[in-house]
UniProtKB/Swiss-Prot annotation:
Description of how the protein assembles with itself and partners: Homodimer.
Alphabetical list of PROSITE patterns matching this protein: AA_TRNA_LIGASE_II
The organism of origin for this protein: Cytophaga hutchinsonii (strain ATCC 33406 / DSM 1761 / CIP 103989 / NBRC 15051 / NCIMB 9469 / D465)
Record-linked InterPro entries: Aa-tRNA-synt_II, aa-tRNA-synth_II, aa-tRNA-synth_II/BPL/LPL, Asn-tRNA-ligase, Asp/Asn-tRNA-synth_IIb, NA-bd_OB-fold, NA-bd_OB_tRNA
Record-given protein name: Asparagine--tRNA ligase
Catalytic activity: tRNA(Asn) + L-asparagine + ATP = L-asparaginyl-tRNA(Asn) + AMP + diphosphate + H(+)
């Protein structure tokens, strides 16, 4: 008989009454007496468990002894209407197979609750908890929704390289990739590491962004997006930073900054609505356990138009408020999370899109405004998060881009291929980046970014 998933059984319970089924999964709990045992079984398809009723007389003592929390079992039996409270149906077990035992003396996940800090230490087992099974199902749903959104709009999914010779952000915080002997690398006459002897014949690193390569594709395909891992070697031990994370980066030909903002708002609302429509059981659990306002906040984002505001106007609001900030506010600063969250959570009480930032604090590729002081950048700010999306209209004029490269010290030889897209058939274009884990923080209500990715990579931590 073919196995049925618990989600399918619970979703269509009436049609399975009095039917024989086979279930396989992991034991969450077992209780009972010398006559009957009640097993809560979960197979990962849903937050919910199904109750298995075992007549002790049918099974040998050795089998039942191994049915402990964490054990993997296979059950066949009849679906019946439940006599007890808490579930509409249950399965009366006819046959039982213990596929994999879990010694209750050493299995670290017992019935008691565990702190999130403890669970990070056993990241290989935490998907078996209710919390992290919810997070991982939501992560899957959000990834699926990303592809669905862009596919419906006719965007082309482009795979950009993980190993690259460029620094898209100009930040310099990159992980180097090399096959040179680290104890005795080849050296130049000047005593520098000779990367011409390296695998790629030049210095290379793990990508910090797929944006530049995405722009190249947009200049041929019109509207594209990337969705892949990115890496930043920033020594930031905060609840908002990871060394390895995932980015969604659309790039669109013929989009001005207003078009870019429109797309970003539509995209975020689509993703949040998808979670509400398709993952409500998981959201209800997280709402109950971690954030009592989670679902209301998600609904508010879907239903509320985002505020659109110039950076200068935002600075004026922040200076005028009586709120005390750790970082002083003045025109020209890069707004901190506390400033962004004040605007979103206290002043407007809704998502905000900030535009027209000072040129000096933004990347070289952003298109300058006519005032010469600001660029057509945009950041989307969310409650509880701060910046969730960063983007801009890109500079499409070759001479202006070359001039900007000189200003920030970027050698044209390093990005000659990027500059050539402005040399041949240049077109106005825009794009943005959405940090997938920051989206997951918002959608799940979790407080630490290390709890929304299966195996977090942070300073001094690369386990599993």
């Amino acid at each position: 008989m073919k196995r049925i998933k618990i989600k399918e059984l619970l979703s269509n319970s009436s049609q399975y009454i009095d039917q024989q089924v086979v279930l396989k999964g992991w034991v969450r709990t077992k209780r009972g007496n010398k006559h009957v045992a009640f097993v809560a079984l979960n197979d990962g398809s849903t937050i919910h468990t199904i109750q298995i009723v075992l007549d002790v007389a049918k099974f040998n003592e050795e089998q039942l002894k191994d049915v402990t929390t964490g054990a993997c079992i296979s059950i066949s039996g009849k679906v019946v209407t439940s006599q007890g409270a808490g579930q509409s149906i249950e399965v009366q077990g006819d046959t039982l197979e213990v596929i994999g035992v879990a010694d209750p003396e050493t299995y670290p996940l017992q019935k008691k609750g565990h702190s999130l800090e403890f669970l990070r230490e056993i990241a290989h087992l935490r998907p078996r908890t209710n919390t992290f099974s919810c997070v991982l199902r939501l992560r899957h749903a959000m990834a699926f929704a990303v592809h669905s959104f862009f596919n419906e709009k006719g965007f082309v999914y482009v795979h950009t390289p993980i190993i690259t010779g460029s620094d898209a952000e100009g930040a310099g915080a990159m992980f180097q990739v090399t096959t040179l002997d680290l104890k005795n690398p080849s050296k130049t006459k000047e005593g520098e590491v000779d990367f011409t002897k390296d695998f790629f014949g030049k210095a290379t690193n793990l990508t910090v962004s797929g944006q530049l390569e995405g722009e190249l594709a947009a200049m041929a395909l019109g509207e594209v997006y990337t969705f892949g891992p990115t890496f930043r070697a920033e020594n930031s031990n905060t609840t908002r930073h990871l060394a390895e994370f995932w980015m969604i980066e659309p790039e669109m030909a013929f989009y001005e900054i207003q078009d870019n903002m429109d797309l970003a708002e539509e995209f975020l609302k689509y993703l949040v609505k998808y979670a509400l429509d398709n993952c409500i059981d998981d959201l209800n659990f997280l709402n109950e356990m971690y954030d009592k306002e989670l679902i209301e906040r998600l609904k508010s984002v879907v239903e509320t138009p985002f505020v659109r505001l110039n950076y200068t106007e935002a600075v004026d609001i922040l200076i005028a408020t009586k709120q005390k900030f750790e970082y002083k506010v003045e025109w020209g600063i890069d707004l901190q999370s506390e400033h962004e969250r004040y605007l979103v959570e206290k002043h407007f009480k809704k998502p905000v899109i900030l535009t027209n930032y000072p040129k000096a604090i933004k990347a070289f590729y952003m298109k300058a405004n006519e005032d010469g002081k600001t660029v057509r950048a945009m950041d989307v700010l969310f409650p509880g998060i701060g910046e969730i999306i960063g983007g801009s209209q890109r500079e499409d004029n070759l001479e202006k881009l070359q001039e900007r490269c000189k200003e920030v010290g970027i050698h044209e030889n390093d990005i000659w291929w990027y500059l050539e897209t402005r040399k041949f058939g240049s077109a106005p274009h825009s794009g943005f980046g959405l940090g997938f884990e920051r989206l997951m923080l918002f959608v799940t209500g979790m407080g630490n970014i290390r709890d929304v990715i299966p195996f977090p990579r942070t300073p001094q931590s690369a386990e599993f």
